[in-house]
């Protein structure tokens, strides 16, 4: 039995082009949307024709463009504020995906208000792959009812061989112009064992600008289980 709609106003339910057409787009299986709404969207997809020899070398979809929005006959104040689904005209959400070759790919997701003059959500990520070297960047900006996060992040990894790799992650908070953290990990992995050395540095936690550092070791043996050491850097 499905209950009548609950008050979900305070729930965090940002919509995008993937979720806006879902029957469970409000993210609560115990309730349904009340009232009437119309969801419309458009999609453009450019694909590459490839032969069997190229099947694993190049991405099939080169360019993706998507736009969608929701119209409602009456305002529904019980809908999540971050989703804008309770308004007569919701935000316009969109996606642009670009994969011209097997070295580079990029995705851009955004939300514009219904007047198309306020960019509420702005997320851009790009990935570069050259042999065993992979680096990716992500930029996120939230405004208005969606949130207030704003950061840029990088994740980089390099595989020395089939078993050994090193990875690095760093994030900078653009709102306060401070680096949040950086992580460094060296990992060895085979069929039955994974061993890693991890270094983590947080530059601030919950408003405290005092940096914290951690260095620890982890070991996983199949099927015996996993072990992780305590922080070996004195506080």
Where do the language-model regions lie?
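Outer-membrane beta-barrel translocator/pore domains, especially the C-terminal barrels
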Residues: 1-235
């Amino acid at each position: 039995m499905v209950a009548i709609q609950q008050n979900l106003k305070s729930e965090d339910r940002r919509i995008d082009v993937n979720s806006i057409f879902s029957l469970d787009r409000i993210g609560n299986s115990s309730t349904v949307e009340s009232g009437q709404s119309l969801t419309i969207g458009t999609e453009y997809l450019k694909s590459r024709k490839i032969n069997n020899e190229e099947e694993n070398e190049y991405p099939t979809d080169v360019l993706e463009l998507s736009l969608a929005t929701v119209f409602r006959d009456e305002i529904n104040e019980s809908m999540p504020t971050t989703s804008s689904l309770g308004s007569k005209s919701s935000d316009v959400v969109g996606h642009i995906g670009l994969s011209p070759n097997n070295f580079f790919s990029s995705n851009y997701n955004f939300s514009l208000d219904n007047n198309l003059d306020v960019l509420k959500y702005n997320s851009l990520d790009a990935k570069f792959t050259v042999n065993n070297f992979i680096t990716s960047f992500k930029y996120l900006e939230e405004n208005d009812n969606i949130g207030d996060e704003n950061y840029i992040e990088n994740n980089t990894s390099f595989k020395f061989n089939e078993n050994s790799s090193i990875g690095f992650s760093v994030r900078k908070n653009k709102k306060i112009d401070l680096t949040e953290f950086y992580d460094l990990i060296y990992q060895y992995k085979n069929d039955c064992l994974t061993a890693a050395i991890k270094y983590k540095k947080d530059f601030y936690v919950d408003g405290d600008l005092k940096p914290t550092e951690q260095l620890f070791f982890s070991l996983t043996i199949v099927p015996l289980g996993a072990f992780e050491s305590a922080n070996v850097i004195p506080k």
